[in-house]
Design a protein with these regions (language model features):
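Conserved donor NDP-sugar-binding/catalytic core segment of glycosyltransferases
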Residues: 95-127, 200-201, 205
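Catalytic donor/gating beta->alpha subdomain of glycosyltransferases that bind UDP-sugars
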Residues: 173-235
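Acidic donor-binding segment of Leloir-type glycosyltransferases
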Residues: 20-65
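N-proximal low-complexity "stem/linker" segments adjacent to membrane-targeting elements
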Residues: 1-25
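Glycine-rich, basic loop-to-helix element that forms the pyrophosphate-binding segment
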Residues: 62-78, 99, 149, 153-157
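Short aromatic/hydrophobic "clamp" motif used to bind/position activated sugar donors
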Residues: 83
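Membrane-embedded multi-pass helical conduit in multi-pass membrane proteins
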Residues: 245-315
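Acidic donor-binding/catalytic loop of UDP-sugar-dependent glycosyltransferases
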Residues: 42-43, 90-103, 185
């Protein structure tokens, strides 16, 4: 078996259906699918059963333990030479696995990851969120962009790793947020060959509304400090930008009663985002939504970063995450 596709799932049967359908359309066929349900209240077993005669597919249900441990559970029960880790809210183009195989044949790698895109069927909000998570003007290009301010770290929505490397590293940690970056850091620290496969991209839905998106990025900001406490050298300038942006916006807003021109930098940045997103998505409507998504992405991450910095670096508290009771709902 060449590839095992590991998919952790929590309350997303409809998305699993779309992902499995896209797996049936792959031009490269030497793979199995391992679905691991993380104690969902809305299980996807009935959906999985409809693909038993179309895919080499295996379904498991286990007590809730978060995405990292759920991936480990699936990896232990898989058979592939390479493990492909995907989020359940992804849809694959027909040439996805073929693109991975082509890259590995051209130049072997121990681990790899690919970028993400927005499918034409996604809502305008989803496309705006996709822009905010992939644009150089919001992330510095660190999530697989051609322009980037830091090296590429594979992320769990689209990641691959050799089975023996996965085993040697002990799989994902027990972190509920940032566990994929933790894993990628350990890949590089272990001296393994790891790189971006630019043509192995996926359509990634992410969060479907701005409230859920804020919760996600806020926890990402918290996770960055949790990672810093484990790996101090992992904190780079690009990771400080959302926190700096958040502080800058707060200062400028506080200055508004004294000088209306203090809003100018905020307005110019919003205009830049709107123009860039409108051009990329060919839609002014999405461009306007992208302003909201980008500010939520930066401020959500920034406030999470500052919150964790205060609690962990100043008060000396233990690792934590926010919205623990309802984040997965």
């Amino acid at each position: 078996m060449r590839y095992s596709v590991i998919i952790p799932v929590y309350n997303r049967p409809d998305e699993v259906d779309e992902l499995l359908q896209s797996l049936t359309e792959q031009s490269f066929k030497d793979f199995e699918v391992v679905i691991v349900e993380d104690c969902s209240s809305i299980p996807c077993k009935e959906v999985v059963d409809t693909y038993q005669d179309k895919l080499d597919i295996h379904y498991y249900n286990k007590p809730n333990s978060g995405p990292g441990q759920t991936r480990n559970y699936g990896a232990e029960r898989s058979a592939g030479e390479y493990l492909i880790i995907l989020d359940s809210d992804c849809i694959l183009p027909a040439g996805y696995l073929a693109a991975i195989e082509k890259e590995l044949q051209a130049s072997p790698a121990d681990a790899f990851g690919g970028p993400d895109r927005a499918h034409e069927s996604f809502t305008d909000i989803q496309k705006a969120i996709n822009y905010s998570m992939t644009s150089f003007f919001t992330t510095g290009g660190i999530r697989g962009g051609k322009k980037k301010m830091d090296k590429f770290y594979p992320r769990s929505f689209n990641m691959g790793v050799k089975r023996d490397v996965y085993a040697a590293l002990g799989g994902f940690s027990k972190m509920r947020f940032g566990e994929d970056i933790d894993f990628s850091i350990r890949i590089f620290k272990g001296g393994y060959r790891c790189r971006l496969f630019p043509d192995a991209w996926v359509y990634h839905k992410r969060r479907t509304d701005l409230k859920k998106f804020f919760k996600q990025v806020h926890n990402s900001g918290i996770a960055r400090i949790n990672l810093y406490k484990k790996y101090p050298e992992s904190l780079k300038v690009v990771h400080l930008l959302p926190a700096t942006f958040t502080l800058g916006v707060a200062v400028l807003l506080l200055g508004t009663p004294f000088c209306l021109y203090s809003l100018t930098p905020i307005a110019l940045y919003a205009l830049l985002v709107c123009i860039d997103s409108s051009i990329q998505n060919r839609s002014l409507h999405i461009g306007i939504y992208s302003i909201a998504a980008s500010f939520i992405q930066l401020i959500g991450y920034g406030t999470g970063f500052w919150r964790a910095w205060w609690n962990r670096c100043i008060l000396g508290k233990d690792e934590f995450e926010a919205f623990k009771k309802n984040f997965y709902k």
